[in-house]
Amino acid sequence: VTRQSGAVKSKDDLGNNNRFNLELHVGGSNFWNNTSFEWFHGSNAGVETSGGWADAYAGAKSANVYRIHNMGHYIFNSYFGVEHLISYAYGTGYDKEYKSGSVYDAGKDYVEYSVEKEKLFKAVVRPTVKLTKMTKLVAELGAYKQIVDTFEGDKITENGQKYTLAYCITPDTGNLLWGPAIKFFVTYIHADKHSDDYGRQVVGGITSYDNAYQDVNHNTMFGVQAEGSW
């Protein structure tokens, strides 16, 4: 059995799950690139379009997710390099048991929706500039957009962006993009969620909560981070 959202799900609820990958690796002395084409089927399919871990969703046991994923790095010279990630995923075949989230309706009350199909695009770019033998400046720019079509006939759009600037102290910047470092960083995060014509059903004689909008969230953070990767 598997525990899901506080309830115990049997293997019959979850169904089989499969993952198939086709990958292309290309590399050289100053670059590396990986492109993968992925197909997820069954109860692990719902999570891949929302960026989660290997959870299992009973409502996704007949679903399919198709994803193309590209990541890599390029080192232009000993002072400048860039890492990147681009991903697009499309999921369909969920049943109404699969719940993906909630939005505010016009009455400022949360309403759950059931996913029929969903799309997710995300991209991250991370340029690094060497300043001295032991210091470097790293920027990270990331964004995503997720579009969900619901069984209720509505469209939920969610966007998010994250911008980080970090000053790094490292034993040796000869390893430009990686290596242990102490990072002093500032990060700005922004996200919003919008539903088009949500809640057209009649509830207590009231119809149509058109163009409901969940409040925009944003935050700025400062911090220090120790990193030990090579």
Tell where the protein language model's regions lie, with residue ranges.
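Outer-membrane beta-barrel biogenesis signature
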Residues: 171-183, 194-195
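Outer-membrane beta-barrel "beta-signal"
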Residues: 165, 169-171, 208, 213-230
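C-terminal beta-signal and adjacent terminal beta-strands/loops
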Residues: 188-202
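Short proline/glycine-enriched turn/loop segments at secondary-structure junctions
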Residues: 80, 153-155, 173-175, 212-217
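Surface-exposed loop/turn segments flanking beta-strands in extracellular/periplasmic regions
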Residues: 106, 201-212
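Detector for outer-membrane/organellar transmembrane beta-barrel domains
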Residues: 1-4, 9-152, 156-164, 169
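Extended hydrophobic secondary-structure segments that form protein cores and membrane-embedded regions
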Residues: 1-3, 36, 180-189
